[in-house]
A protein has these predicted regions:
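Structural preference for beta-rich elements and adjacent junctions enriched in aromatics
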Residues: 1-175
Length: 175
């Protein structure tokens, strides 16, 4: 039985993940993933998933250097067919942080989990014992030319509280 909550583990499902090292610092990245039910999984990766060792306590939702509290604005759709399943990701650039300019290089890797055979495959080969968070071993995309995306998103909401005092006080009484 699959867990359909956002950021639930994808390790027991047929799933697809990819990581973007947008600064090409070989340490940090943005991880996105899904399964055949189009569950959204995203996280910020710090220090290849090891986190900041100088910080002694962990924040809820942050495991080592994997910040699951980060919820980017993006969408994924999946389709099942005779061939298996496929997914299409739509990730606005405003959801990511990156340098602006021409001819940039980003790190990237892809991971496919096949639950039936307990197989995990990577696009950029990783030694046994490492996972997709190892951005220092990721492949590279060269020649990226990006302009500054508008980083404005309005999400109106209302939060209200009403308190009514039903007690009766005799304010005219004098002692």
């Amino acid at each position: 039985i699959s867990d359909s909550r956002r950021d639930a583990s994808l390790s027991d499902d047929d799933s697809f993940l990819f990581i973007l090292d947008t600064y090409n610092d070989q340490q940090n990245g943005f991880l996105f993933g899904t399964n055949s039910s189009a569950m959204e999984y995203d996280a910020q990766i710090d220090n290849e998933g090891n986190g900041n060792r100088s910080v002694s306590r962990q924040q809820g939702g942050v495991i080592g250097g994997t910040n699951l509290n980060w919820d980017a604005s993006w969408d994924v759709k999946s389709e099942k067919g005779d061939y298996g399943w496929s997914a299409e990701f739509a990730i606005p650039l405003k959801s990511l942080r990156f340098n602006i300019g021409k001819n940039q290089t980003w790190g990237i890797n892809f991971q496919r989990n096949i639950s039936k055979t307990s197989e995990t495959a990577y696009w950029a080969s990783l030694p046994l014992g490492f996972d997709i968070k190892r951005v220092s071993l990721a492949g590279k995309i060269d020649g990226i030319d990006l302009k500054n995306p508008k980083n404005l998103k309005i999400m109106p909401y209302v939060l209200m509280q009403s308190i009514e005092d039903k007690s009766v006080k005799d304010l005219d009484k004098t002692d």
